[in-house]
């Protein structure tokens, strides 16, 4: 037996191969190792497995993965089809799978166009942007309009036959150059086998091409002016001050009652919303066997209280996160885990301390129950994702610090599960049975549409939650924005339809535009976007904040790549993002505020505007570092203080601090300005209290670091509310007029701290309780 050759250890004087990436100092003894390391900088995982969406930097690794994980398993007879019903792209003429209701001519044209891109990976030494990138992306967007599982005709009101693709869906065009896509000609007619799983995050061909985030960002900016805009004169016209709402033209008032048709805020339950006695008995038995609840807690959970908590879910939570379809959901038939997620969320909003403690106890077991359920096995059922999303929002935004931290850990599990797609066995996607006629066909088509729209809403609201927690808590986003290349949500009145007849009457509404072109329009600021619903506007805002996070990443050279390839000046990319945020606010005013469609004090409006202000703040401030600095002050931790004080001092000396301070003043004034009283216990926007806390820290840090103190505006005056209003007025005047008035009052933040402590102290959310404790210690300094 021949002995294996023993490799010689590295010796001094041997050749070292250095990484060519700018700023990297690593070197390697072998050239291939240096090349492999270089790809980690460019994130060039251009080879995508069509079976499981795994990505690789080398084609040989992809081929080995496919042979070991998919081909051999298929040859052994373990599966008749690949796990996700996707076909390996090779040199042969194999076809990418499309839903059976998509015309074959569309499939062939889209496949031919995309295959030419997929087979050519983007290498590190090649330009990020190819000459035909924009054309290819637009073609991919056009393809998703046809091939996406959730897209269906709203103009075809017939109740028989198969679903057809309307002509307008084949060409997404809203009379704007940023939304135009090429049309696709018809050539053939074929039928494909039904899928075993349904994609949640877009379709396979689109994701296979649009897998590179850097390329996507380049596409967003490729039509911009070559010279970046300059910073505008400092003022408060981009804030949420009600006095500024007359800056935009007023549109005609809506002809329908927008609030009643789009926001179902009533807590009146119909029969299907009520838990029957038999279902209630089964629920109590499951809770007694699987959830560690005391006898007192089980006795407290009466049937009438359960129905009350369900009502609060629909009244307080659903209008903000409408991903459950109330018209078709029957609580008696809902899985226990989904029902418990709804009930516990209602327990939070009902305002009862004992009910809230029971909800926290239930969530210590609920997630485990979902993970061990047979329906969680990939591809999971739709209700699994719905229950997990409700659970994550409860645990992150209302529960204890421990559950908050665990929820962030399990967030990745949920997203990874979603990548595997949605099980088709629990969704109405199959063809209409031959023996089905009349009313049954109508109901079938309605439920079919509901399943598709519900799946799309899970994708978008998961993206919103993921993006929201980036700016709230500084977490790293786990959902790549390129994976939500989907048409936006349907009109909420259509989603709220509680019968097939009501749904049919609204089907002639316009189809929603695609997310990516709309996002690009807000970044270019050149054209007024199409009329969007409040929920779609919220999705766009979170898309903009995600782009800001991508551009702020270090050592990846994204901005340099964009400038090199299309000549756009992005050195001041923060100015571009700020301009897009302001354009979003102006558009929001035109759509909803100036015409009275939504009142300024509407809870949903207040939640969106708080997110807008925090988006500006997070663009210019490391919120986590600021929180850590405040914690180091009250804990006297030298290590924490040393690591954050340098950042805070540098931040204070930069222009970033002034921008953040302005928006913090806006935020506090929106909560506590004038005679306003804030009730945190009745707050339905779960993120808003945290926005107030962050804004308070920013204003405190500005005064404390500058002057070394925190004091009352008028010593001897114990009316904190009046002193707070005087402080806000002088800060606003001084900052907007570039005067020095605010320098005198900048350290007069003691009334602010006391007022914020008073309004936030009733909160039960563990993270906010810790924040109030820090503010209380800052008062005592």
UniProtKB/Swiss-Prot annotation:
Protein's name according to its UniProt entry: Zinc finger protein klf1
rRNA processing found in the keyword field: no
Taxonomic superkingdom: Eukaryota
Consequence of gene disruption: Defective in supporting the G0 state, while normal under vegetative condition.
PROSITE patterns for the chain: ZINC_FINGER_C2H2_1, ZINC_FINGER_C2H2_2
Keywords assigned: Cytoplasm, Cytoskeleton, Metal-binding, Nucleus, Repeat, Zinc, Zinc-finger
Conditions for induction: Abundant in nitrogen-deficient G0 cells and rapidly decreases its levels upon nitrogen replenishment.
Record-level Gene Ontology MF annotations: DNA-binding transcription activator activity, RNA polymerase II-specific; DNA-binding transcription factor activity, RNA polymerase II-specific; RNA polymerase II cis-regulatory region sequence-specific DNA binding; zinc ion binding
Function description: Required for maintaining cell viability in nitrogen-deficient stationary phase (G0) cells.
Organism classification: Eukaryota, Fungi, Dikarya, Ascomycota, Taphrinomycotina
Recorded name of the encoding gene: klf1
One Gene Ontology biological process: regulation of fungal-type cell wall organization
Organism: Schizosaccharomyces pombe (strain 972 / ATCC 24843)
Broad class of the protein's primary localization: nucleus
Cellular compartments annotated: Nucleus; Cytoplasm, Cytoskeleton, Spindle
Transmembrane regions listed in the UniProt entry: none
InterPro entries named in the record: Transcription_factor_dom_fun (IPR007219), VerF-like (IPR051059), Znf_C2H2_sf (IPR036236), Znf_C2H2_type (IPR013087)
